[in-house]
Regions:
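Short, charged recognition helix plus adjacent turn
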Residues: 2-3, 62, 69-77
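DNA major-groove recognition helix of helix-turn-helix/homeodomain DNA-binding modules
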Residues: 53-69
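Recognition helix of helix-turn-helix/homeodomain-like DNA-binding domains
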Residues: 31-52
């Protein structure tokens, strides 16, 4: 599966909104819970560059009340 540029950013922003938070509120939660920078511009830049680490995504999911679950998809040949 090829992922289009901007797809990950859009998905993360959508999940933040679906959880009932603004980007600024999500950044504040990450700062409080995990010691992230409280800079919204830094977080936005990471999303734009698609440079979030897997650990970062897990922490973001946690503060939003989500859990990342790997689900087996189609078999590859």
């Amino acid at each position: 599966m090829k992922i289009k540029k901007g797809y990950i950013r859009s998905q993360i922003k959508a999940q933040i909104m679906l959880a009932g938070y603004t980007m600024a509120e999500a950044v504040e939660l990450l700062s409080t819970e995990y010691g992230w920078s409280d800079s919204l511009s830094n977080f936005s830049a990471q999303l734009r560059r698609e440079s979030l680490r897997y650990k970062d995504v897990l922490e973001l999911a946690d503060v939003l009340g989500y859990e990342i679950v790997w689900q087996k998809g189609r078999d590859r040949e």
